[in-house]
Amino acid sequence: MSDYLKDSEERMKKTLNVLKSELAAIRAGRANPALLDRITVNYYGTPTPLNRLATITAPEPRVLVVQPWDVSQIGEIEKAIQKSDLGINPVSDGKVLRLVLPELTEERRKELVKLVHKKAEEARIAVRQIRRDANDLVKKMEKDGEISEDERKRREEEIQKLTDKYIKEIDKMVEAKEKEIMEI
C-alpha cells in the first residue's frame, strides 16, 4: 500500500474513532458510563477527567453510580456533573453519587437523532476532505512526471474505494445509534 493511501486510511480511521466517541457520549435510553467521559473535575486545582477520579458503573438500566476513589472530592465531582449539559442531578450519600437518568421523551429522542446525523455529516465531510487531499497529491505527482495519467486514474479509484468504505462505516454507526435512541 502506498504512503499516500496509508496516510489517508490512518486519517479516516481517526475520523471514525472521533465519531465513535462522540456517539458514545450521546445518551440513548439506557445508562452508559461513557456519558460522563467528557466531564472534567477540578481536582486540587487541575482539570481532571472524571473517569480518572472515580469508578463509574451502570447497575440498573437508567442509573449510573459514581464512586470516587478520594471521597473528599465528592463535592467537586457533584458540581462538575451539575455544570455539565447532561441535565442530571446527582444524589450523594457521602460515599457515592447516584445519577438517575430520566426517560427520554419522543421530542428529545428526535433531537438526539438530529444531533447524531449532524455528527455523522461532520465525519463524512472530514473523510471527503481527506479524499480531496489524497487526490490533489496524486494529481501533483502526475504533473511532476512521477506517475502516468493511467496510474493517476488507478490511484484515484483506490482512494475512492477507501472513501466509500469509510462512508459506509459511518452510515452503519449512525444507523445503530439511531436504533438505540429510538428504542423504548
UniProtKB/Swiss-Prot annotation:
Localization annotation: Cytoplasm
UniProt GO BP: translational termination
Primary location group: cytoplasm
Keyword terms of this UniProt record: Cytoplasm, Protein biosynthesis
Pfam families reported in the protein's UniProt record: RRF
InterPro entries named in the record: Ribosome_recyc_fac, Ribosome_recyc_fac_dom, RRF_sf
One GO molecular-function entry: ribosomal large subunit binding
Gene Ontology, cellular component aspect: cytoplasm
HAMAP family reported for this sequence: RRF
Record PANTHER family: MITOCHONDRIAL RIBOSOME RECYCLING FACTOR PSEUDO 1, RIBOSOME RECYCLING FACTOR
Role summary: Responsible for the release of ribosomes from messenger RNA at the termination of protein biosynthesis. May increase the efficiency of translation by recycling ribosomes from one round of translation to another.
Family of the protein in this entry: Belongs to the RRF family.
NCBIfam families in the cross-refs: frr (TIGR00496)
Protein name per its UniProtKB record: Ribosome-recycling factor
Organism: Caldanaerobacter subterraneus subsp. tengcongensis (strain DSM 15242 / JCM 11007 / NBRC 100824 / MB4)
